[in-house]
């Protein structure tokens, strides 16, 4: 990349900082949830909505982000994404109630949904094709550093300042990024086909209402009538979209995707798999602080081995899948993740805190292997004309499943923890024990789906589609 013009390198730096802001925000908030609950006068059982509101908004907005960038221009959309994300951060810091915080996180999510896919599109347009992989490696590196710094940085800010600062630190970065975007980034546009607005609204309504209905009366305090109405709207919206997309070449996502057996298994497995593993980043810092009495900083530090294990495993995951095949890797990793979550709970309750970093390191390795395998399995057999649509749907499902996973984790805590749960609660350990046992069952369930994957260990078949989808 040293032979790229200076202006292109500066543009890559802008995209990299956008990736960093978005990835940092996904991990820095988890550590601060108990402190937020105390400051806002809320039960920790309700704080999962701070995560759900952001991730669900990202899932809803993802399908529109690429089209908007092509239609309006990458500079305009990337600038808008940074401004919305920064404004959302400011409103989060100023929030005095949980409802205000949740609404501010929705605004953040709109910006976050546009930032990463539009950033990828920008890199594709400003660098030569032969240097695309090197450029993407460069801009995504800060995105890998974000999850590493997030938990510890969140713990430091909460312990030595206040939780408001986990959002305020986005302001200077966002202001500089917005100015640099207007100054340095070209406004590339592309010819676009007509956007399926009706299909987008149907899918958005279905995802949002069903996720809110899942949180239901315990989490949101809504009436039975409202709950039933949300469920009906959600189901009708999804069924209406399926009817709308039938034989519709302009549909947001073609139903032809589901005729591909590998894609169908991979997508369903990815949804159920991430539903389980999406609970862990939310539950771990909450358990460490509320269940074990760790300080926010100590809890944040404990999350670092998990991120290191995940990053380290990415270097060898292709070789592992090539050697053992998708079916063995996915089934073993799924059952292994369920087991390691129980080991983490057992080691913690026995007071062997010095072993926890090692357990979390292995948890990160297993989770990373499973994520990478699910992604490439899902896309590897798609024909070229469906690859882009299939990748977009997979990205949306990934975010949606993590949103549902955090919601389910909050429901489990609420079911076992009743009205309130604090560090001084006598039954806190039992509450988290039952919650983790239930989570382990949910995490293990996708093994039944992955057992149906053809046992193909051919190297070309395993990584061939991955290389084509990255071009």
Curated annotation (Swiss-Prot):
Chain ranges passing through the membrane: 12-32, 49-69, 72-92, 101-123, 138-158, 165-185, 195-215, 220-240, 265-285, 286-306, 342-362, 393-413, 431-451
PROSITE patterns tied to this protein: MFS
Compartmental location: Cell inner membrane
Alphabetic keyword roster: Cell inner membrane, Cell membrane, Membrane, Transmembrane, Transmembrane helix, Transport
GO-annotated molecular function: transmembrane transporter activity
GO cellular component: plasma membrane
Bilayer topology term: Multi-pass membrane protein
Gene3D superfamilies in alphabetical order: MFS general substrate transporter like domains, Multidrug resistance protein D
Keyword Signal applies: no
PANTHER family given in the database record: BLR6921 PROTEIN, MAJOR FACILITATOR SUPERFAMILY MULTIDRUG TRANSPORTER MFSC
NCBIfam families assigned: PRK10504.1
HAMAP family per record: MFS_MdtD (MF_01577)
Family indicated by similarity: Belongs to the major facilitator superfamily. TCR/Tet family.
The protein's name: Putative multidrug resistance protein MdtD
Organism of provenance: Enterobacter sp. (strain 638)
